[in-house]
Curated annotation (Swiss-Prot):
<dbReference type="InterPro" id="IPR004101">
    <property type="entry name" value="Mur_ligase_C"/>
</dbReference>
<dbReference type="Pfam" id="PF02875">
    <property type="entry name" value="Mur_ligase_C"/>
</dbReference>
<keyword id="KW-0067">ATP-binding</keyword>
<keyword id="KW-0131">Cell cycle</keyword>
<dbReference type="InterPro" id="IPR013221">
    <property type="entry name" value="Mur_ligase_cen"/>
</dbReference>
<keyword id="KW-0573">Peptidoglycan synthesis</keyword>
<protein>
    <recommendedName>
        <fullName>UDP-N-acetylmuramoylalanine--D-glutamate ligase</fullName>
        <ecNumber>6.3.2.9</ecNumber>
    </recommendedName>
</protein>
<keyword id="KW-0133">Cell shape</keyword>
<dbReference type="InterPro" id="IPR036615">
    <property type="entry name" value="Mur_ligase_C_dom_sf"/>
</dbReference>
<dbReference type="GO" id="GO:0009252">
    <property type="term" value="P:peptidoglycan biosynthetic process"/>
</dbReference>
<comment type="function">
    <text>Cell wall formation. Catalyzes the addition of glutamate to the nucleotide precursor UDP-N-acetylmuramoyl-L-alanine (UMA).</text>
</comment>
<dbReference type="GO" id="GO:0051301">
    <property type="term" value="P:cell division"/>
</dbReference>
<keyword id="KW-0963">Cytoplasm</keyword>
<keyword id="KW-0132">Cell division</keyword>
<dbReference type="GO" id="GO:0005737">
    <property type="term" value="C:cytoplasm"/>
</dbReference>
<feature type="binding site">
    <location>
        <begin position="115"/>
        <end position="121"/>
    </location>
    <ligand>
        <name>ATP</name>
    </ligand>
</feature>
<dbReference type="Pfam" id="PF21799">
    <property type="entry name" value="MurD-like_N"/>
</dbReference>
Length: 440
């Protein structure tokens, strides 16, 4: 079936790296199609890289363009409930995202990962281990490189991180294996409630051969599994990929076979043990022999901006967990901590309508000073008696620096999005790392 039959005019909504990847893909693989771009921002990121022969409408919507399109490709940051997109749908014009275009194009095996937390680590590690096992893997999607920019005849396995936003506009992505890691409150400014958010995530299983799900979080299980093989991972409940005692030590197990001791992992924190089990389950389901890649697994230290030690001077650790953009992510970071002295926890930013109170009982058990900043930083103030509000991340670090001593830890794990004061979570983490090195 030729999906492109009758499509002569495509409107791309939202530029940035994803929008640019769509434009570049269309020009390379469908050069006869007319492409127009709409971006409601006055200065869209990426406009300087846009070819001069592609028409760009900035600073608002252009309904005439939209309603004359044969296909609209929308950025995942734009909700389908947006009135202009609703008008397009009402006119019978298909609205898809970049992942759907990728699905139309690719025949090579694909595995994909979604969930509230841990997606990027699982995606990255899956790619690292697949390549170490001799399978040429390309990694991207919601992490790093947009999916359409990955397309190459050399690739033997695509590994995609998919957000709930991307899944909303994806309907035909065939997957060898799909993992749903966990579900916790996030993006409540976009969804009606947790049920809606979960349903968006579950779309990952629509055309998957194997569903890789979390035995410790039954919300990750598909509602309708008739067409699926289901494989489980977990550390609390019985699962096919799990932990068990072996030769007096805790081991990772794959289908009743000991793989390696947890102590041999370089990754820090209990949540990362779960992430590793997920990767083993995914690769096994996709036919990749992960046993050929155990050296790579042992040496893997994780992603930038995810519980990353950026400075360690005079016994004071500075840890960048800027990728913690929701409460569950910050809770995961706190659960794996080993602190000898005082913890200085930096929280705040754009809260996305989240409930921060689940942090309170955990903070009560820690020797913590809570340092709050950002547009929603005030919402953290009632969570702990030590809480103080600051104008900026730099003002926090200037203020606490004189009292830091050996054994202390300064942890940026904000539980919020970054776009009140920073371009993105990477920029936030980079600035924290610079400040850490400056003041350490």
């Amino acid at each position: 079936m030729d999906r492109w039959q009758g499509i002569q005019h495509v409107v791309v909504v939202g530029l940035g790296i994803t929008g640019l990847s769509v434009v570049n893909y269309l020009r390379k693989y469908h050069p006869s199609v007319t492409v127009q771009v709409i971006d409601t921002r006055e200065i869209p990121p990426g406009q300087e890289q846009l070819s001069s022969d592609v028409a760009l409408h900035r600073g608002g919507w252009n309904l005439e363009w939209l309603l004359n399109a044969d296909l609209v490709v929308t950025n995942p940051g734009i909700a389908l409930a947006t009135p202009e997109i609703q008008q397009v749908l009402a006119a019978g014009i298909p609205v898809v995202g970049d992942i759907e275009l990728f699905a139309w194009h690719v025949d090579t095996p694909v595995i994909a990962i979604t969930g509230s937390n841990g997606k990027s680590t699982v995606t990255d590690l899956s790619g690292v281990l697949a390549n170490a096992a001799g399978v040429k893997a390309a990694v991207g999607g919601n992490i790093g490189v947009p999916a359409l920019d990955l397309i190459s005849p050399d690739v033997e396995l695509y590994v995609l991180e998919l957000s709930s936003f991307q899944l909303e506009t994806t309907s035909s992505l065939k997957l060898k294996a799909a993992a749903f890691l966990n579900l916790s409150e996030d993006h409540m400014d976009r969804y009606q409630g947790m049920g809606d958010y979960r349903q968006a995530k579950l779309r990952i299983f629509d055309h998957a051969e194997t569903a890789v799900v979390n035995a410790d979080d039954t919300q990750t299980f598909p509602d309708h599994a008739a067409h699926l093989q289901v494989v489980t991972f977990g550390v609390e409940q019985a699962a096919q990929f799990s932990l068990a005692q072996h030769q007096g030590r805790e081991y990772l197990f794959a289908r009743d076979e000991a793989v390696m001791a947890c102590a041999e992992l370089s990754l820090v924190g209990r949540h990362n043990v779960t992430n590793v089990l997920t990767v083993l389950a995914l690769l096994d389901s996709a036919g990749v022999n992960f046993r050929l890649a155990l050296d790579a697994l042992k040496s893997y230290t994780g992603l930038t901006h995810r519980c990353q030690v950026v400075a360690d001077n005079h016994g004071i650790k500075w840890v960048n967990d800027s990728k913690a953009t929701n409460v569950a992510s910050t809770l995961a970071a706190l659960s794996g901590l080993k602190i000898e002295g005082q913890l200085y926890l930096l929280v705040g930013g754009v809260g996305k309508g989240a409930d921060f109170t689940p942090l309170a009982p955990v903070l009560a058990t820690l020797p913590v000073q809570l340092c709050c900043f950002g547009v929603d930083g005030h919402q953290f103030m009632p969570l702990h008696p030590s809480a103080r509000f600051y104008d900026s991340m730099e003002s926090i670090i200037r203020s606490i620096r004189p009292q830091l001593k050996s054994g202390d830890m300064v942890l940026l794990s904000p539980a919020c999005a970054s776009f009140d004061q920073f371009k993105n979570f990477m920029a936030r983490g980079d600035i924290f790392a610079q400040l850490a090195r400056q003041y350490a």
